[in-house]
Amino acid sequence: MKKTLLALLIASVMQSALAAPATPVREVDRIVAVVNKNVITWQELQARVNEAIKQLEAQKVAPPPREVLERQVLEQMITEEVQLQYAASGGLRIEDAAVDQAVANLAKQNKLSEAGLKAQLAKDGITLDRLRADIRRELTISRLRDSEVASRVNVSDSEVDQAMKSAQSANRTEYHLASILVAVPERADAKQIDQLSQKVHKAQADLAAGQPFAKVSAAYSDAPNALKGGDMGWRSATSLPQEFVQLLEQMKVGADTDVIRTQQGFFIFKLVDKRSGGAPMMVEQYHPRHILIRTNEAVSEADAKARIDQVRDRIMRGAKFADMAKLYSEDGSNAKGGDLGWVNMGDLVPEFEKAMVSLPIGQVSQPVRTPFGWHLILVEGKRNQDVSSDHEKMAVKQQIRARKMEQAYTDWVRQLRDSAFVEEHLDEK
């Protein structure tokens, strides 16, 4: 099936499906969930279900029964809503400039002008305003993840050393995995745990009966990748817990694990493929300078933005970036003219990296908002670097941090969901 533009946009930018415009399925709308003081309607749910079906079909995955998918998508929408409400309560706001840049990037990636993007979206029944709203939602959740979770994740030298030792014993094998997660709430009682255990074993029975893993994942999994067939992509041995690597070493390609109980809930994993990872580890590195104006109780968002605009104006009129960094930057790199040295992807927060990689060498960015404040960025160089020897430890640390970030974020979202007031009315007619 030929993918729509929307599916391409999802694949290139979003981690979850972009919502299509609400298309009434019934003449009378109704509330299907209450999340604190907000509601999710039947028509909103149906629009997201329709988009989920398109996404699955684009992956050549047969969707589960619609009523099953409705329940899965509704839970996704509830989880999104509690995060968006939390962000709003903390004053987290995505500026229009960030949305403008994301739209421009989408058009560029698909080799379209803005007018061409509008026209192509219209063919898929999507307005540009709706796309912008979806992008704003995804950027909000992404920034929330960084501000609430990233600062709490640490990786010790001993963890890195142990991972490298394990990788050597595993001959640097890489694994392509898929997963099904039946999440267990933090304060679940024995009855809830038993019900969830029955759910995951029903999923296991469907797999044993020959149902495709991707279809079972879409029907049962609570993980964000459920509607992507549970696909986790390629994972190196260093990015996985040692006990799990030992299990994978004994499995054949195509096999599923038994049900595995973890702190998050019940997992079933599929070993889709595996390969030797002994080739050189080439990473793209960037050499940026930056100027940071922080926001805090004494400096408002508007004041910080005005200050960074003034600094940029001086640079555009001929002032040297390094001199301005020494004078105005509120980062520890100011003494070095804002020089951050050579950095790898994953070293910096996503908003900074996204702006950095799009900049031509020698060009000063527009102001960039991150959880730390407002930045100006100047890229002085970029290169591909082999990190398989001297810099392997750095790469391993990044992999471990990414895994711990994923788990910490999942745990944090679960706690946020459990603490919210949620009423579901999907079964009410």
UniProtKB/Swiss-Prot annotation:
GO molecular function: peptide binding; peptidyl-prolyl cis-trans isomerase activity; unfolded protein binding
The keyword Chaperone appears for this protein: yes
Signal peptide residues on this chain, from the entry's feature table: 1-19
Enzyme class: isomerase
Locations listed in the record: Periplasm
EC number: 5.2.1.8
Domain of life per record: Bacteria
One cellular-component annotation, GO: outer membrane-bounded periplasmic space
Record domain PpiC: where: 172-273, 283-381
One of the Pfam families matching this protein, by short name: Rotamase_3
Keyword line: Chaperone, Isomerase, Periplasm, Repeat, Rotamase, Signal
GO terms for biological process, alphabetical: Gram-negative-bacterium-type cell outer membrane assembly; protein folding; protein stabilization
Reaction it catalyzes: [protein]-peptidylproline (omega=180) = [protein]-peptidylproline (omega=0)
Protein function: Chaperone involved in the correct folding and assembly of outer membrane proteins. Recognizes specific patterns of aromatic residues and the orientation of their side chains, which are found more frequently in integral outer membrane proteins. May act in both early periplasmic and late outer membrane-associated steps of protein maturation.
Domains as described in the record: The PPIase activity resides only in the second parvulin domain. The N-terminal region and the C-terminal tail are necessary and sufficient for the chaperone activity of SurA. The PPIase activity is dispensable for SurA to function as a chaperone. The N-terminal region and the C-terminal tail are also required for porin recognition.
Record protein name field: Chaperone SurA
